[in-house]
Regions:
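Beta1-alpha1 glycine-rich phosphate/pyrophosphate-binding loop at the start
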Residues: 1-70, 152-178
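Conserved beta-strand segments of alpha/beta enzyme cores
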Residues: 29, 70-72, 118, 165, ...
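FAD-site-proximal beta/loop scaffold in flavoenzymes
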Residues: 117-138, 218-284, 291
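A Rossmann-like FAD-binding core segment of flavoenzymes
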Residues: 73, 80-81, 162-252
Length: 365
């Protein structure tokens, strides 16, 4: 019997498990290793915070996708993955594999030391199950980083706590640098209307206690959220190629070795070294991953290559029953934009990325 290990339980692995749990796995043992009992979808996090969605709406319970006697779910922390020995080492054990697929995500760059009761990093997303209720009354919420996550979180908390004092700090001279001019103008107008302060060209040098220090000043806060970029997770990859941020190098078919694949934020695709870390790319990777994993294990079909889309839809939930939709140079701010976002997100959570007709290519003859 061969062994497939799924390291991590991201959405790509949920898709694989949703198919495997209904298959005859007499010749295959599947081990799922994760330290999180739920897998969250970051795109719906603002809606979860502002009260539009429940915990069940925005997350998967991993054990619900392990309903097959040949699928074993292990809750543990992965510390090392050894390509040479074909083994995954965790805090409490060691597991050999014939095939390995990794979906381990990324983590926030911890620029200001470890988390505290008042300092929080946006990733991993799991922590927001607890952060949903931070800050109320007249508290001061500081958000460091003016990208999409920072802006959406500011607007979500503003909706949830109308009396909350919110400040976004960014080291650049503008926010939402990966968006078009129209989107930036709309966002700044909305932030201003909601009394959310934005400090530009301000680089936080250190945080001590509940004080953030920058050149020429300091800012007191009750809670701080940091969203200033991501790095690879804290795992030792023995025998693999990684980049300077510990992102795992794979080819455009998502292979790190002949029997090892990976997907999502954790990967650095050699053919596309400058591809952004964004959920829209991971979504498009998922059918490629499922196809190639099943091809390696079961045969059938052909290996497929992933090519990132050059232009993609971006939607910012403004937590006022509207959203800003951005496409190329175009942007619109209205209720329709939010309806489009919610439709995309809910379809994504229903897991319709891999169809039954797609799976027929792997049926036993």
């Amino acid at each position: 019997m061969k062994t497939l290990i799924l390291a991590g339980a991201g959405h790509g692995h949920i898709q694989i498990l949703s198919k495997l749990q209904n298959m005859d796995l007499d010749d295959l043992k599947v081990i799922v290793i994760t330290n999180f009992d739920r897998q969250f979808y970051s795109g719906m996090l603002p809606g979860y915070i502002n009260g539009s969605f429940s915990l069940e709406d925005v997350s998967f319970k991993v054990e619900d996708y392990c309903n097959n006697p040949n699928i074993e779910l292990i809750f543990d922390v992965i510390e090392e993955i050894d390509k040479n020995e074909n083994v995954v080492k965790t805090k409490n054990g060691s597991y050999s594999f014939d095939y390995l697929c990794m979906n381990l995500g990324s983590k926030s760059i911890e620029s200001f030391g470890p988390e505290t009761e008042s300092l929080h990093y946006v990733k991993p997303i799991y922590g927001f199950k607890e952060l949903k209720d931070i800050g109320g009354g007249k508290d001061q919420l500081l958000i460091i980083g003016g990208g999409a996550a920072g802006v959406e979180l500011a607007l979500a908390y503003s909706h949830k706590y109308p009396g909350l004092n919110i400040t976004i700090i960014d080291k650049h001279d503008d926010i939402l640098l990966k968006f078009n001019d129209r989107t930036r103008k709309l966002s700044k107008k909305i932030l201003d209307f909601r009394n959310i302060k934005v400090m530009y060209n301000t680089d936080i040098e250190k945080i001590e206690g509940n004080t953030a220090y920058y050149e020429g000043g300091e800012l007191k806060f009750d809670q701080a959220l940091v969203s200033t970029g991501v790095t690879g997770v804290d795992i030792k990859y023995t025998g693999f190629e990684v980049d300077e941020k510990n992102f795992l190098k794979v080819n455009n078919k998502l292979f790190a070795a002949d029997n090892i694949l990976a997907i999502g934020d954790m990967v650095h695709i050699r053919e596309f070294p400058h591809m952004p870390k964004a959920g829209v790319f991971a979504i498009r990777m998922t059918p490629i991953l499922v196809n190639n994993v099943f091809h390696v294990i079961f045969g059938g079909g052909e290996l497929e290559s992933y090519v990132p889309q050059e232009r993609y839809l971006q939607i910012i939930n403004t937590s006022d029953d509207k959203a800003i939709l951005s496409w190329g140079p175009f942007a619109m701010y209205n209720k329709l934009a939010l309806k489009i976002k919610n439709k995309i997100d809910m379809d994504y959570m229903k897991g319709n990325l891999v169809t039954d007709s797609f799976m027929k290519r792997f049926e036993k003859k």
